[in-house]
A protein has these predicted regions:
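FAD-site-proximal beta/loop scaffold in flavoenzymes
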Residues: 53-77, 154-156, 161-234
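Mid-to-C-terminal Rossmann-like scaffold of FAD/NAD(P)H-dependent oxidoreductases
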Residues: 211-304
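Rossmann-like dinucleotide-binding cores of NAD(P)H-dependent redox enzymes
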Residues: 80-81, 88-145, 225, 243-251, ...
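Redox-cofactor binding/interface segments in oxidoreductases and associated redox assembly factors
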Residues: 25, 38-39, 170, 207, ...
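N-terminal Rossmann-like dinucleotide/flavin-binding domain of flavoprotein oxidoreductases
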Residues: 1-33, 118-136
């Protein structure tokens, strides 16, 4: 009320008319706008999984999802959880569940933990730390089916192995939620396409956060969201402002083996250099000229994050 904001909870948008500058709600109500910001977030990636219990596989992307997951664990008296995916979400859940006294088996077609963020040596350090706490990993195969097996489930892998569990969690990642925008004729690529002022190709329509692809960058983390919010607030208040992304290392919540990573750009030309022994590994990605383009720190090496971040180039200067 102090900010003169009306928040409508449990309200779904059916469509957007960018020509009439109107948002249509389910139920028929139409809301005109002078400027519209799309902050649609990200949606869970659902790999193709068959079996008579495929619909029982849970994913967690919001508080309601988390409550359903916790309720299922409690209702079943679950003690063992199978996790599909060993990336950021999968590893964080693995650590949390192990701390809660659960047994965890995780499956991922890649070769080590956090494969899209960490080089192999660093990912193996995370794997070893989680295995020491009791986790079991199946790297290489895909989960193809989830079937009911007594009071629990059987997860079938494409190498013929089976994982038995009381609950199955899908944690293969998220992608920008873009359907509402694309249905309205707004340009979409990996996310809702914007320039550095967060403008889409539709007049007076902006996008920010996990749903947006800002000047070619899709960054589904908190720090980029905050930078975008500050820039867009200034623009909407009359001071046109480009968003800037400094180097923004990501802290991954795996206390068994703390991780801080600032991945190099996908097209970066260089190679990884390693210092230390697991779990305390400092991995530096340097160009041929020696410029630091990214880093991955595990264990005690995370203490160097601030000093190393100062050496990195901006993501979007």
């Amino acid at each position: 009320e102090q900010l003169n904001v009306t928040v409508r909870t449990r309200t779904r948008v059916a469509s957007i008319d960018t020509h009439l500058q109107t948002v249509h709600l389910e139920g028929g109500e139409a809301l005109p706008y002078s400027e519209l910001v799309l902050a649609l977030g990200a949606e869970l990636i659902r790999p193709p999984i068959g079996g008579d219990a495929a619909e029982d596989v849970l994913g967690v992307n919001d508080l309601d999802d988390y409550r359903r997951f916790q309720d299922l664990l409690a209702a079943k008296g679950a003690r063992k959880v199978a996790i599909i995916g060993a990336g950021l979400i999968g590893c964080e859940f693995t650590n949390d569940l192990l701390n809660g006294g659960f047994t965890v088996e995780a499956v991922d077609p890649m070769g080590w933990c956090l494969p899209t963020l960490l080089p192999e040596q660093s990912g193996r350090a995370v794997q070893a730390a989680l295995e020491e706490k009791g986790a079991t990993f199946h790297f290489g195969p895909l989960a193809t089916e989830v079937n009911r097996a007594g009071e629990g489930y059987a997860v079938t892998l494409n190498n013929g192995d089976t994982i038995e569990a009381d609950a199955v969690l899908c944690a293969v990642g998220v992608r920008p939620r873009t359907t509402l925008a694309s249905d309205a004729g707004i340009e979409v690529n990996r996310g809702i396409v914007t320039d550095r002022q967060l403008r889409t190709n539709a007049p007076n329509v902006y996008a920010m956060g996990d749903c947006a692809e800002v000047a070619g960058h899709v960054l589904v983390y908190v720090a980029p969201l905050m930078a975008a919010a500050r820039a867009l607030a200034a623009t909407l208040a009359g001071e046109t402002t480009d968003v800037s992304y400094p180097a923004m290392p990501v802290a991954i919540k795996t206390p068994a083996c703390p991780v801080v990573v600032s991945p190099p750009a996908k097209d970066a030309d260089g190679e990884w250099h390693f210092e230390g022994d697991a779990p305390d590994i400092k991995a530096l990605f340097r160009s041929g000229a020696g410029e630091l383009l990214g880093f991955a720190l595990t264990g005690q090496a995370v203490k160097e994050r601030m000093a190393l971040a100062k050496e990195l180039p901006a993501i979007l200067g």
